[in-house]
Regions:
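Internal catalytic-core helix/loop-beta-alpha segment
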Residues: 112-138
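Short beta-edge/loop segments at beta->alpha junctions of small alpha/beta modules
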Residues: 1-73
Length: 211
């Protein structure tokens, strides 16, 4: 039988872990052990086959780190990324990501995780962000869209934002739009999307901010 203390020592540095990672250290690890530890509050289930230790939940970036791990490949984008950068005013409770896998929705103690599907040719425009592990001795990486990609992902995946009035409902930060938006990167990314409808939405958005 796998002992919890040794199990925690091996798996804790991963931040969160899958049952397959657990079995790479402990081939005899059974689901009964995971169920028992979950009931005792020693580990917390994130989705089927994925778990974390409770002390990790206090880390600032942990919810976003989990997003990149429990459904991969994916990167944090859309409303969550825009909120992270301070581009939209409201706090976002749902963690929104983009993936090449099928659209999915998960819920756990950290909140709700939403994944929107894009084709592989549109899976780019993100960067790695480091999260220091609990003991400070190592770091784990999660993936975050650049501001311009998060904005384009939103306009591409949410057809609701199709008129100037609807685009204004996003309440994008004016300082970001007029002073910090990387216009060169935005145009480069827009060309890579190669989508006439998206071009039209971006044109309307830039008009609102007189860009």
């Amino acid at each position: 039988m796998v002992g919890y203390t040794e199990f925690r020592e091996k798996l804790h540095p991963f931040g969160c872990f899958s049952i397959y990672q657990g079995r790479s250290f402990f081939p005899e690890l059974g689901r009964n052990s995971l169920v028992r530890w979950t009931k005792r509050g020693l580990i917390i289930r994130l989705r089927q086959g994925w778990y974390a230790f409770p002390d990790m939940f206090s880390k600032t970036d942990f919810s976003r780190f989990v997003a990149s791990r429990i459904y991969a490949p994916s990167y944090v984008s859309l409303h969550t990324a825009l909120s992270f950068y301070g581009i939209i005013p409201e706090a976002v409770t749902q963690i929104t990501s983009v993936t090449t896998l099928k659209t999915a929705l998960f819920e756990n103690a950290l909140g709700q995780y939403s994944y929107k599907t894009v084709k592989s040719r549109l899976f780019w425009g993100y960067k790695p962000v480091e999260m220091t592990s609990a003991d400070g001795s190592a770091s784990q990486t999660w993936f975050l869209a650049h501001p311009e990609k998060a904005l384009l992902d939103l306009l591409y995946l949410y057809p609701f934002y199709n008129s100037e009035d609807e685009l204004m409902q996003l309440r994008l930060d004016e300082v970001f739009m007029t002073e910090e938006l990387n216009r060169e990167r935005l145009q480069e990314y827009l060309l890579r999307f190669n989508n006439k409808v998206l071009n039209g939405r971006v044109k309307k958005l830039l008009k609102i901010y007189e860009l």
